[in-house]
Amino acid sequence: MKQAYLDLDLIQLSTENAAVHLNKEFVLIDNLDEVPEQTNMEMEFVNHPVKLSFTIAIFCLTGRMSVQINLQEFELRANDILIVLEGSIGEYRGMSDDTRIAVIAFSSEYFQTALQVDATMSLQHKLYSSPFYHLSPAAMEETMAIYRLMKAKIAETDNPFRKGVLLGYTQVLTYNSYKYLLAADADDGKLNGKSGRQQELYTRFIREVQKSYTKERSISYYANVLCVTPKYLSQVV
């Protein structure tokens, strides 16, 4: 019986033709320097669902790219970002000939940042429920500048501190992402107060996160600990 999806890990992703990586745990892929007839990025998992064992961020600079994430369809255009968390099931459908993209894929270790634990988990949930958002041209320009710094740092094979630097750059991108999402929430009027019961659950959730975050990062795990459904916990946090 054919498996419903392929398991995709960073080791496999790091073997793609356009990939550069650090220890097969931090992978960059782009077609920014290619001419139009070379932009068709051939990947063995095109048009087949894959389950991700890592987090991936896709930045679209021009053109159109079609993907499906957890059965939801997305079309990326200029200055769009799609951030897909570990455990998601996605499918790459294709892109237009004029598409320019940059991809950052990394293990969960790189998602740990200097953000407070509650802010980090809040960002993680927001990205799980709403992985797609649009950047201003200036914000995308800053993001691509950081991407190029990451790529240059990976190329410094004689530098023993590359991982630390990449962790730092990832922190910058995470802070920026959280800022963009908070601004989007404010613009959309989505910041609603929690009821007393929800606030109590949220407080317990944060307490559990502080105890177990280095080992457990999934909403499902904490929902089980708190004896609620993952869906309800996601709505609260």
Describe each region flagged by the PLM.
Residues T157-G164, Y178-R207, K211-Y221, V225-L226:
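Short, Lys/Arg-enriched, Trp-marked, Pro/Gly-tolerant hinge/linker segments that flank
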Residues V237:
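DNA major-groove recognition helix of helix-turn-helix
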Residues L71-E86:
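Short acidic-glycine-tyrosine-enriched beta hairpin
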Residues Q3-A4, R93-I154:
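A hydrophobic/aromatic-rich effector-binding and dimerization subdomain
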Residues M1-M65, Q72-F74:
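Generic protein-terminus/edge-of-domain signal
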